[in-house]
């Protein structure tokens, strides 16, 4: 479901950018899509692994072990987010070169990716909180957050690109802000859960 919503969001981004900003911007977004999915897939793999560990402890009703697992998973998620963000941002020019992105659209690609991947900690936060919620039996909240984020992303795309003229940077910023909203919603719902009791 998460991937389906990501597809909807990405297709909306592509349609808006292509219609308003033209062929070069559209080509840039299409070119970096594989990088975007690689980063997202890595983050999802990490956080889903944490979710499996937490769900096992939660299902076994081992509250002390559960608390420790959540603490260590949270710490590792923070460390991974920091290292991943720094590494990706430093390595972006080289990565774009390895992928043989056409020279004329490289600046557009980098403008988009620097803003988007500056929000990697927020991607990690959303996916981590979503994984924790699923581990506790709540699969509705992550989906709701994802749908809300997709709608906000489209609205912000139109505002930042049409009204403010921020180009592909505006499209990337819209995604980061939408991710922030999704993260905040999931974090709030997670704070309401008493881990000693099953969710309903």
Residue ranges of each PLM-predicted region?
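Short, small-residue-biased leader/transition segments that mark boundaries at the very start
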Residues: 3-8, 197-199
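Extracytoplasmic
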Residues: 5, 9-18
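Alpha-helical transmembrane segments of multipass membrane proteins
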Residues: 11, 128-132, 154-159, 187
């Amino acid at each position: 479901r998460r991937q389906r919503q990501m597809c909807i969001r990405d297709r909306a981004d592509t349609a808006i950018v292509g219609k308003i900003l033209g062929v070069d911007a559209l080509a840039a977004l299409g070119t970096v899509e594989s990088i975007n999915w690689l980063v997202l897939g890595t983050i999802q793999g990490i956080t889903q692994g944490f979710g499996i560990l937490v769900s096992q402890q939660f299902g076994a009703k081992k509250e002390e072990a559960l608390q420790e697992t959540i603490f260590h998973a949270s710490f590792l998620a923070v460390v991974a987010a920091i290292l991943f963000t720094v590494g990706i941002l430093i390595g972006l020019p080289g990565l774009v070169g390895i992928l043989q992105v056409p020279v004329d659209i490289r600046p557009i690609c980098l403008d988009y990716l620097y803003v988007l991947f500056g929000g990697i900690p927020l991607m990690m936060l959303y996916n981590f909180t979503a994984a924790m919620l699923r581990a506790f039996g709540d699969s509705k909240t992550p989906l709701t957050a994802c749908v809300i984020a997709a709608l906000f992303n489209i609205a912000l795309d139109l505002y930042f690109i049409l009204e403010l003229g921020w180009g592909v940077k505006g499209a990337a910023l819209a995604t980061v802000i939408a991710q922030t909203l999704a993260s905040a919603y999931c974090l709030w719902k997670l704070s309401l859960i008493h881990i000693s009791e099953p969710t309903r």
